[in-house]
Amino acid sequence: MIGKCKAIAHGSTALDYIFREGKLGYRLAFHNLCSREPKAIYEEMKVVSDYNSRCRNKFLRIEIGIAPQDEKKLPVSELMRIAHLFAKRMGLDNHQWVAVTHKDTDNRHIHIIANRISLYRGI
């Protein structure tokens, strides 16, 4: 597996991208979120991120690539576990994040969009 992470300012665009019809595979996790649709998720995250006015790039865009030889061996439950474990090790327990898979390429991958601002207002 290979993970990539970047701080971004355009959380709404990133959420629209990961939920785009034709790309979306499985909805793996919604952490510290009530909403399930991209626009509502963004609004929910924005309420929390607005507490920190100094941070510019308030969202994290994370992609976890699954090795081709492992794709067939990993059921959805294992992909969920991977997403939760990755987020935990990134220190995102007190943050809002959503994880999905994409099916638009030959290689399965997980996308996570996370709020950099925690529920307790820290980064």
Annotate the PLM regions:
Residues 1-123:
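N-terminal nicking endonuclease/strand-transfer module with a His-rich metal-binding environment
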